[in-house]
């Protein structure tokens, strides 16, 4: 993975084509892409390194079940589900192939793919 700022952050609306079909794309709330070769005029063609979804009542099933499975299959390295209703962040570290970790908003969430980065979600809700 590139060091010294080689990754870029994209926010919705931004198409992520995780299958070889432009008709089947997702628009994550936030995605971090470290491989510039995946970027095109259509969006990101392939799996971003890290995706963050903010759950809403209408997206709960999609974020926790449908997108989780799709992101895992596509090769996303890390997936965070930020859930305001539950005041927690669920972290899937697909690189480690481990069970998800659930962290309350008032505790720091350690990023798996960027070891020097941790985020306390409650700091951004004030």
What are these regions (language model features)?
Residues 1-4:
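Short helix-capping segments at alpha-helix termini
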Residues 7-74, 81-126:
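C-terminal interaction segment
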